[in-house]
Amino acid sequence: MDIIQAIIIGIIEGFTEFLPISSTGHMIVASKFLGVAETDLTKAYEVIIQFAAILAVMLIYREKITFKKIDLWMKLLFAFLPLAIVGFIFKDQVKALFNVQVVAWMFIIGGIIFLIVEYYYKEQAWHVKDVEKVSWTQAWWVGFAQIFSLIPGTSRAGATIIGGLLAGLDRKTSAEFSFLLAIPVMAVVSGYDLLKHYQDFADANWGAFLIGFIVAFIVAYATIKLFLVFLQRFTFVAFGIYRIIFGIFLLMIL
């Protein structure tokens, strides 16, 4: 992987990881057009840029990553449990699901679900507007929704945001809870992948890896900030439409 490829993939990871559009499908397209083979080394690089994305969230929400916010973090860990349990038990079945057809169709299905939810969703005065006021029950339902992100192409952000909306959170709080929930999820997943691929770093182009890490961090940081501004004025309809179009595009080219 050269520096240009590392930068482009870093941009895609940073931009798509926290939006409800699934980074998986975009990585597939990027790898195809960039001619990047799916090797252990590229998987190792993906681990590096995922850590960059985690750091972006931690920097933005650094005031919430303290012992004073222990109640919030207990709820986030509680929400993480369904995914951890189901993912561990059915890891082989989940791995068998990974193919482009599944990814494409989950883009389309996820897009349709977003459009349906937004058609009926109306923000109410009783909706939770502060991520620290999310209840244990609401945290559980967001965590339950996250299970569906085990299906490739679903989008972890998309599943948790939908779960948040259905559980009674407003749009911004749904997104913020999703961002924070990404920290334990991605830390565990990326940590596991790091242990699996640490030997592959011996052959790494560290210059490309470092630049990709920095790019992914900057893009993820900017994307989260802009996404929150976007949600103050708009709904998730645009993401639903985009998912459907991108899913059809995937079916046509791959």
From Swiss-Prot:
Its EC number is 3.6.1.27. It comes from the Bacteria. It is found in: Cell inner membrane. It is a multi-pass membrane protein. Catalyzes the dephosphorylation of undecaprenyl diphosphate (UPP). Confers resistance to bacitracin. It catalyses: di-trans,octa-cis-undecaprenyl diphosphate + H2O = di-trans,octa-cis-undecaprenyl phosphate + phosphate + H(+). The chain crosses the membrane at residues 1-21, 41-61, 70-90, 97-117, 134-154, 175-195, 209-229, 234-254. GO terms for molecular function: undecaprenyl-diphosphatase activity. Bacitracin is thought to be involved in the inhibition of peptidoglycan synthesis by sequestering undecaprenyl diphosphate, thereby reducing the pool of lipid carrier available. One of its GO terms (cellular component) is plasma membrane. It comes from Sulfurovum sp. (strain NBC37-1). This is Undecaprenyl-diphosphatase. GO terms for biological process: cell wall organization; peptidoglycan biosynthetic process; regulation of cell shape; response to antibiotic. Pfam families: BacA. Keywords: Antibiotic resistance, Cell inner membrane, Cell membrane, Cell shape, Cell wall biogenesis/degradation, Hydrolase, Membrane, Peptidoglycan synthesis, Transmembrane, Transmembrane helix. Belongs to the UppP family.
